[in-house]
Amino acid sequence: MAEQQLEQIEGTVEDIIYENTDNGYMVFEVSGGGVVTVVCGIVGELHAGESVVCRGRYENHATYGRQFHAQECETDMPKDLEAVYAFLASRSLPYIGAKTADKIIDLFGAEALEVIANDPARLTQVPGISADKADRIQQEFKRMFGMRELIAYLAQFEISPRRAMEVFRTFGPGAMQAISANPYLLCGEPLQLDFRHADSIAQYYHMEGDCAQRLEAALLRTLRHNAGNGHTCLPRTQLLETASNFIHQPPEKLAAALDECIRTEELRVKLFDGTPYIYLPDLLEAEEDIAARLAMLTKRGKNTAHGLDKNIQILELTQGFAYAPLQKEAIRKAMTENCLVLTGGPGTGKTTTVNAVLQLLEDQAERVALCAPTGRAAKRLSELTGRKASTIHRLLEVDYTGGVVSFIHNDKNLLKCDVVILDEMSMVDVKLFQALIAALRYSCRIIMVGDADQLPSVGPGNILGEIIRSGLVPTVCLNEIFRQAKRSLIVENAHHIISGEPLQKGGKTDDFFFLESDGDAAQRLVCDLVTTRLPRSYGFDPIRDIQVLCPTKLGPTGTQALNVELQNLLNPEQTGKPQLQSAARVFRVGDKVMQVRNNYEIIWNRIGGEQGVGAYNGDIGIVESINTRDRSMVVRMDDKRLVYPAENLGELEIAYAITVHKSQGSEFPAVILPVAQVPPRLCYRNLFYTGVTRARKLCIVAGRRDVVNRMMGNIRQNLRYSGLAYLLQAELPPEQTEAE
């Protein structure tokens, strides 16, 4: 079907009703042809008196009536006397209000804006405007119309006004000059625009496909893209091959560009087992810092723990049970070693061991900081230990000054604690762990707790796996399932999954079930379980208690399709219920939503009065209210309320169904795991294991038995390129460890 043609209106901006300067979303009135029209859309920056041509469509807003939703907007500098006066009187420029606008018009008439742009010294003829003020007025005028010019320029390359504004903020008034000289700057930090946009601009300027800027940008983009997939580095040959396939240039040409990047230290190279690995500099620095600090902790003399065995016996008498041999070993090492990895599957006593260590540390009056990578994991750690726990970000105190993430606690402002216990270690990426260990005092110890069989972090690195693989950091792996945990089929089957043994079938009173289904029938089954069967049989709240965890986003049982179906079933569109459209998503009051990328600036208010900042990837909440006028939403996440303005709605996704990857560090009362259609690259044991172990009271696997068998039979973990194990071994050679 042919795309419907956009309607067009033109006229003069009469009034600005609403403006968001961060993302360029505006609501304004346009007067033309004797009609005043309310226009809304992301248009950049407009002011009263400007001439505009808007293209889009009329929409009927439930609250505000008929509006014109602009998808494109062209502007022109005010030209006639009335429009020039309206612009000056709108207070768009510093030091100029209605009275000063009258004086400027009296002196310069319709040429006033030409004077401001090209001969600001003449403004000093106006009483009250000094030479300094005249220069400031010109600077703001050029900034305003420079941004407008850039928005129009980049629009021809399909770059949105919002992204164009980001480009202007990055490069300033010289943005067009910088981009025309090297369009591939747009693909780098911090913008990371799509490579095709840069290619379009480069073709416009007749730049060759094998120019140095394009080759170097392709190498950097390939490394950044793979960092997003978890790799901290890539083998040289794989980097060249991947970049070659991406931009269709021979590897030989890219090799020359790579050598130049290494020479200028834009990229770094390390040799591991005779193979050169290429790094982005910040990721190599992160792994080197981690290796150096862990080696220092391991080399440092052990701590004395007088009467430790007696104190463990007293704990056993107090608790009314005896610790298993491996638990005792872990407790002893936690009290004597400067760093320790404690790992094990569900039901093996990690929490019991950590609580014992906490009690002994507190008996010695040691200051302990408990932390985890996500808010949900920190909350769970607090519940399990009965002590305050925080996210790593909260512990270090995020500082987002100037749009750059840093932490108040760092190597110059160390944490005031003696021991850090870090839970869910498998989720921690290299940059965050680098920041944490940098903030530890020389005498501070660290205990890293996690399940090595779970999926690695969403961000780059595989820290827990690499530390264990190095064999050089003290590690205790708990492997005994305790009696109370054996009553749970969730726990029992989790261990069957890891060992590759057949799953145990659940009976009526069990907590694990497999329901066979396929395709659209599997989708209907999942929806029926969420909306009807589980709430009726177990009393679960379908939104707050039940979580669908999907291996993939695509297909009938992927997150995208299931969220559409579940939203329509659990929270359908209703007259009078506010909703917002953001890209392809519709948000309604009552929807379950998830934060999908870190926002270090968003303000939250805790119910009870405390205020703070930050929402992090994986945080889940409920939409409490929607303001359709300014397109903002209030979301409640546990005991916090956050206001999401229009420009931040892209950080949220509907979350009735989420991916297994996004569920890391969380637990849910009931989990439904659809495995009817799983792409081969996601068909592996660790992903299935991670999904099952997110369930606290009930786990239902719905899908095909052959898919389950393939997942359990595929022991391939997601291969992640990382040099941390090699760097640790270089810092702490095995023979030195054995000699000690």
Predicted regions and their residues:
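Pre-P-loop entry segment of helicase/translocase ATPase cores
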Residues: A155, R214, R224-G228, V269-R332
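Conserved helicase motor core of SF1/SF2 NTP-dependent helicases
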Residues: A356, L360, Q364-E366, A372-L384, ...
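Hydrophobic anchor at the beta1->P-loop junction of P-loop NTPases
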Residues: L342, L370
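Short aromatic-glycine-enriched beta-strand elements
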Residues: E19-E29, R629-V634
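Conserved helicase motor core of P-loop NTPases
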Residues: A452-V613
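C-terminal accessory regions
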Residues: I607, N617-E740
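Accessory alpha-helical DNA-binding modules that contact the DNA backbone or grooves
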Residues: Q4, Y25-S31, V38-V39, H47-Y58, ...
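Structural detector for short beta-strands of small beta-barrel domains
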Residues: Q5-N20, G56, I620-E624
